[in-house]
C-alpha cells in the first residue's frame, strides 16, 4: 500500500479542516495563458463571422459562428479545470476587434492561429508531463481538438491554392464548396 493511501486512512483531528491541494503555480500560469489564447481565438472567429455576414458570405459566416462558439467552450473548459482545483482563473486582456480584407486572409490567419495554439498546448504538455500527470492528461483533449482544427484549415489553405482569391466569383464558388 502506498504511503499516501496509508496516511489517508489514519485518524485525524476532526477540528482541523484541511484545505484541498492546488495546482502548481507554473501549471496555473500556463493554463491562464491558454485561456487568453482561447479568448483571442473566440474574438477572432467572432470578428470573422461578423465580417462574413456583412460581406454576404453566409455559409462562411455560419462556419465562423460555430468556430467562435467552440473557442468560447474551450476557454470555459480551462477555467472550470482551474476552479475545480480551487484556483481562481486570471483572464488576460485580449484583442476583441479584428479587421479583415477578404475571406482568404481569414483562412490564412485562422490556420496560423490554430497551428500556434497546437504548438502552445504541445509545449505546455511537455513542461507539465513531469510535474502534473492529471493536467497533462487534461490537456491532451485540447491537443486533439487543435490538431483537428489545424488539419481542417490546412485543407482550406490547399483548396485556396486552386483559385484566384482576387476573383470574387471564384471565392463564392470556394465558399459554396468548402463551407456548404
Model regions: which residues?
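Iron-associated oxidoreductase/ferritin-like identity signal
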Residues: 1-180
